[in-house]
């Protein structure tokens, strides 16, 4: 019996499960029948299915409909509650819609409605009505008959006033009036009792709020962004249920005294206003969690800001704040702290207590304590630094980095020797050794020391010169006044001004004229005045260019996004407000990042030492100037200084991490405190330590002089010198000599070298195979070369391992298909679409960028074929082409483009091919914080036609999702030409906007 019972129970359970599964399937089927989405196929007329009686949600959006399908009105007797008609082409609300009396939700946004008729009153059961992004100027009085209406969205229209009957909407909770043409705050809203959320942003002529706003007691969320508000009425303080208040992009400079009464406020945005003082009433908002005060004129934060203990988000970027109160470290819940673009030099002690901060932005501040390099690494590094400072005796050691640069034969090396070896004038020799480093104790009594970098003028070294540019250095631009002529100002001076500006914002530059013993007095005066004048002209021209760009962005921001998105001729077609604001911020940053050029031109002679003493005194004076070089007067932990000095002693090329850690122990640094110290020494250019590289993180390259000697070997481009190094071994026979000639020729023409030849070239500098491997790994990390047949294992079956240095490639064109060279796609390939992303550099193209980019992309591509200015390769089976077009005067900027192609259905493969390359290029460009460049996506249709000037779509679109419901874009080069949206927008946003630095 027991067995039968068990069997019966089991059968009952199985039967119950079958019935349950059937019920679930039936419920799911009914659910799918309740929601129906219909789409047009090939622009045919939309036809409704026969039986829609059970359908509750009908979506006819994104169909470009001008009229609704037949039979829609017959659904009035059914269960239809939600009708979606968004993104069509309706000029009026279709009559059939007004007969659907059971509707509770109607979405007819993104159409072309110019009016809403009084028949809207027939939709008496509506709870949600969306009419945004149309062309409505008025709303009918009958809107007041919709007594069940809870949500109304009429944003992005042209409404100038609201009907009086609006106050008859007792259930209305959410009202969106964003971006209309309302000139005053509608008093009808005072009598909408249930209103909780109101968006009034973008009604630009508001100016002020009426006192009667106090009656809106139910408000929880209020948006008043970009409404030209100059003053808030006291009555706003009576909206005691407010939780979020947006007041950004106005002209406010104070808040009402009673503002602290808004005790339920959780979020306040007053960014982009005119506050000069921190509003005292805010200090009473002890439960405030988010405060945005970016882009104001704040100078000081109050000490009692610590009473705002619940703050999680605090944005204070782009103000004029000089210091932070010590009490800010008590804001223990802070997770976002944005302070970039201020004048903060010192962070409070115990700043590391803000351990929850995960969004931290501090760049563009004159930080000296902790050092800028430490602050940029994050809160944990600041904590480690401050802890170290507390553990050890602080030490101050002024040691200024001096960078000499200029054209070949400008006199840099002789000038360095005159400055650093004043006692011995007989030893002066011209320098052709490449880049050289000299330590110069300028004044032992005053403790002033310099480390002098003499950057070679030969263009062969252009790829590595930027590695020696760093913040906090003094740049001496050396000009040969004998060879200087006015019409070549840009070559002698202007180019270097652009170079330093792009790499090092706010850099200090001293211009020194040499060879004055070869010039007469009148010639000197004229040339110095010309240099001074042309610098001013160039700086003014650049500033005016940037100012014009800012005005262009401002004009675009003054337009509705909907206008930009629908107007192909707009300068920023489809670009979001967020990206435009980011772009404007970047342009303003470029405007404020100009060089500090010490004038006038200092003229010297290295032959008779004329004015050398005066130049020395000038350099010492500048070095001691706290406002010019505050970093020289920062306090560092003595243990960090000792660690630096201990690393100078070993003569080896590199140290293992453990060797370095043992030196750290001598300096009093335990292993856990070592990482921060090494990171600082790397960021400040004292040694190289790559903690982000799997191989190199185990080593410390402390001997920079030897490393520079190694770099000089590769970049001097002198065949006789290279050949001499290879044949220095007396045992070299005639066969070997011939091979050496072949290798040198291959290197100088194609950039190719095998490892055994590299080892021979570096023989004086490296001793072991490990030395060689680490140097090659380091050169790859720096983007100077790549291995073309790197073995996956340690052995390559006896084959020779080759390295390629792209900067040496001289052949003009790689072997590639015809379309790469600009010829039209042949007839069978007309279905192929081309993707091309173009980077343009109007002021200056970073030297060596194309060669370094060529190295960085090597891990992403196969079957590559390189020329001097072009790379043809594959990513998987998809072709990619990287091209560089050097600048040709002011009217033809340098251009770097990344291209691929595929058929339209497979265009995602082309995006997949170029996206990693775009990301690598963006990463390299981050090294040039003040570089002005643009990014565009070129029109595929124009490229297919062979147009010499294809239309450029804004590169910002790469960082935006594809617009909802949009399948085609218009090319303004030909108004009737349409291209698929997938040819401009990637499948998902793939890159940071070019102005996000």
UniProtKB/Swiss-Prot annotation:
Q: Where in the cell is it found?
A: Cytoplasm
Q: Which residues form the COR domain?
A: 637-861
| GO CC terms of this entry | cytoplasm
Q: Where is each Roc domain found?
A: 393-626
Coiled coil located at which positions? Answer: none
- One GO molecular function term? GTP binding
One Pfam family from the UniProt entry? Answer: LRR_1
Q: Where is this protein primarily located?
A: cytoplasm
| Chain positions of LRR repeats | 32-53, 54-76, 79-100, 102-123, 125-146, 148-170, 171-192, 194-216, 218-239, 241-262, 264-286, 287-308, 310-331, 333-354
GO BP term, example: regulation of signal transduction
Keywords, comma-separated and alphabetical: Cytoplasm, GTP-binding, Immunity, Inflammatory response, Innate immunity, Leucine-rich repeat, Nucleotide-binding, Repeat
The cross-references to InterPro entries, in alphabetical order and at most eight, read: Leu-rich_rpt, Leu-rich_rpt_typical-subtyp, LRR_dom_sf, LRR_domain-containing, P-loop_NTPase, ROC, WH-like_DNA-bd_sf
Q: What does this protein do?
A: Probable GTP-binding protein. Functions in innate immunity and more specifically the inflammatory response as a regulator of the Toll-like receptor TLR2 and TLR4 signaling pathways.
Q: What is this protein called?
A: Malignant fibrous histiocytoma-amplified sequence 1 homolog
Gene of origin? mfhas1
